[in-house]
């Protein structure tokens, strides 16, 4: 389909407009990324489900790509909690069922780029579990947006799966940073940990800080 095709333009507009309508009035959202290929019995899927459940119990909405694997685990955890929204932003793919049934709100996107934007537009943090090219694409776009000040202040990026991610983090620290491709502050954007209690504590503190600042702003106004 050509980019000047009116159908193409309409579908792009639909993606953004429907995404905004679905998410703009929701607060306390975090996004979870990870492979669609991960089995639900895998340790990382189990961890993702537990973390999503615990965060949802605190009233924190969980956003995922709405697919299988880690995405399903994240939605499943939030859905089981029944204390927050379990949001799935999936993509139309040929010959493949790309959605999971554990969502309270969902949207099917036409294009990857609009879906990727909406996955984090209304989020305050992202938690990245092991994944392939798609997960890496999502993670590095978020890091780039955070690095360049396009995300909300204090946006957090967590990598869960120390053994899986450690060589990537080493590359960032030992190759990108020493050659001047990134700054020291850019390294600090990433938290590598398997401690989900730490993530829960950090995110809760961040969202509580947001709430306090919003209340102060209301008083000043």
Region annotations inferred by a language model:
Residues 85-94, 145-168, 184-185:
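Short, acidic/small-residue loops that bind anionic groups at enzyme active sites
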Residues 22-25, 79-81, 98-101, 118-121, ...:
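Solvent-exposed alpha-helices and their adjacent loops that cap or buttress functional pockets
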